[in-house]
Curated annotation (Swiss-Prot):
Catalytic activity as recorded in UniProt: 2-[(3S)-amino-3-carboxypropyl]-L-histidyl-[translation elongation factor 2] + 3 S-adenosyl-L-methionine = diphthine-[translation elongation factor 2] + 3 S-adenosyl-L-homocysteine + 3 H(+)
Matches recorded under NCBIfam families: dph5
Subunit structure as annotated in this protein's UniProt entry: Homodimer.
Binding site for S-adenosyl-L-methionine: 10, 87, 90, 115-116, 166, 209, 234
An annotated GO BP: methylation
Descriptive protein name: Diphthine synthase
Lineage: Archaea, Methanobacteriati, Methanobacteriota, Thermococci, Thermococcales
Protein EC: 2.1.1.98
Record CDD domains: DHP5_DphB (cd11647)
Any one GO MF annotation of this record: diphthine synthase activity
Pathway(s) this gene product operates in, as recorded in its UniProt entry: Protein modification; peptidyl-diphthamide biosynthesis
Pfam families to which the protein is assigned, alphabetical: TP_methylase
InterPro entries tied to this protein: 4pyrrol_Mease, 4pyrrol_Methylase_sf, 4pyrrole_Mease_sub1, 4pyrrole_Mease_sub2, Dphthn_synthase
């Protein structure tokens, strides 16, 4: 019997596609995980109401260590759905799960849904100009990750934008804000001193992507770090070289300083 990886979309229970909803409704068993992303506009109960089935929520250990014991044996006998926020295959963990299913002889299918990788276009930045993305992680004990700083540096050297995901500690109900991410990047800058991320760096914050009223703000770190971007989830974007239309969009829609337009010659309207 098949295993269906079904995306729930970005914000609430209405983001699932008709195809995903139809398949989830007919499955014999429905599992889900919410530790890789946050759907701020809904609850488990609302999703269950839409699907019409009880959902078994798995934690990180269940998914990463015990998927073969919990989910895959069921999928050999029944139609099973595995629900995830966003698009199922954006999280590398889910790609690995599909490999495990194949090795255990379980046929699997992917039902796509809205993803942050497409929704980020609402910032006005051109999708084809994004480079490698990275996650800004909370330091823990003696561990202070800095790889995201290197990703920003590499992308800026190529004139590319950087999409930064922000750390999630779902088991603690802790979701990093864009402000915290900027603070961490500034700390790394203090340690490295490579002039990659400074108070004068232009950044874009997107909050609650997929909702009807997302936060879209652009400005310099020294100003943005003090702003309230509302409820999480947030993503932080460090723009690379801007096209004139991108710059105009950031000014008109995201409230960026008009001075970012000074590098461009006046446009003929």
């Amino acid at each position: 019997m098949p295993l269906y990886f079904i995306g729930l979309g970005l914000y609430d229970e209405k983001d699932i596609t008709l195809k995903g909803l139809e398949i989830a409704k007919r499955c014999d068993k429905v599992y889900a995980e919410f530790y890789t992303s946050l759907m701020a506009g809904t609850t488990l109960e609302k999703i269950e109401e839409v699907i019409g089935k009880k959902i078994i929520v798995l934690n990180r250990e269940d998914v990463e260590m015990n998927f073969e014991k919990i989910v895959l044996p069921e999928a050999k006998e029944k139609e099973v759905a595995f629900l995830t926020a966003g698009d199922p295959m954006v999280a590398t963990t889910h790609a690995e799960l599909r490999i495990r299913a194949k090795r255990m002889g379980v046929e699997s299918y992917v039902i796509h849904a809205p993803s942050i990788y497409s929704a980020v276009a609402i910032t006005g930045l051109h999708i084809y100009k994004f480079g490698k993305s990275a996650t800004v992680a909370y330091p823990e004990g003696n561990w202070f990750p800095t790889s995201y700083y290197d990703v920003v540096k590499e992308n800026l050297e190529r004139g590319l934008h950087t999409l930064l995901f922000l750390d999630i500690k779902a088991e603690k109900g802790k979701y990093m804000t864009a402000n915290e991410a900027m603070e961490l990047l500034l700390k790394v800058e203090e340690m490295r001193g490579e002039n990659v991320f400074t108070p004068n760096t232009l950044v874009v914050v997107l909050g609650r992507a997929g909702s009807l009223n997302p936060t879209i703000r652009a400005g310099y770190v020294k100003d943005m770090i003090k702003e309230d971007f509302g409820k999480q989830p947030h993503v932080l974007i460090v723009p690379g070289k801007l096209h004139v239309v991108e710059a105009e969009y950031l000014v008109e829609i995201a409230g960026a300083p008009k001075e970012i337009l000074e590098q461009f010659a006046p446009r003929k309207m």
